[in-house]
Amino acid sequence: MERIFFYEDRNFQGRCYECSSECSDLSSYFNRCNSIRVENGNWILYEQPSYRGHQYYLWKGEYPDFQRWMGFNEYIKSCRFIPNHHGQYKMRIYERGDFQGKMMEFSDDCPNTYDRFSFRDIHSCNVSEGHWMFYEEPNYRGRQYYLRPGEYRKFSDWGASTARIGSFRRVHHMF
């Protein structure tokens, strides 16, 4: 069973809230979040309610302060469990919105998009199989964006404010 524990203070101190399913608004359970323990599963955490704001991808392990999950501050207001995926991974990326322009298909990780293909930005994407993470910078750094199967006609559909993607990878379950 998937489980995540949120702590108000660093090093797993202060008020604690246990969660075992997605939650669109964590505000009533804690005011701030400075440490997290993921007991099982992969999770996406969001800085704002209703799955908005900065996104953070966490897997089984301990995160004694928000810098460990590349957090910008102590706010986590919603969370989503990433379901298991068994099978292939497949995603198409496009250099322009609405699936226009050059297209490339991927079934594996890409640590540096700038080395891999000629266009700098990803404006739209179609995820047909698996769950993926986009990162704003190469080598899986910077802002993170979770993509589940579906169509993303513009970069704001995956929560980004720009089309800049420096790397991406498949979400593998680490139980």
From Swiss-Prot:
InterPro entries referenced in this protein's UniProt entry, alphabetically: Beta/Gamma-Crystallin (IPR050252), Beta/gamma_crystallin (IPR001064), G_crystallin-like (IPR011024)
Keyword Membrane in annotation: no
Region (Connecting peptide): 84-88
Keywords associated with the record: Eye lens protein, Repeat
Domain of life: Eukaryota
GO terms, molecular function: structural constituent of eye lens
Domain called Beta/gamma crystallin 'Greek key': residue spans: 2-40, 41-83, 89-129, 130-172
Annotated GO biological process: lens development in camera-type eye; visual perception
Metal-binding among keywords: no
One Pfam match: Crystall
Matches recorded under SMART domains: XTALbg
Similarity comment: family membership: Belongs to the beta/gamma-crystallin family.
Function: Crystallins are the dominant structural components of the vertebrate eye lens.
Comment on protein domains: Has a two-domain beta-structure, folded into four very similar Greek key motifs.
Subunit structure of this chain's protein: Monomer.
Protein name: Gamma-crystallin-2
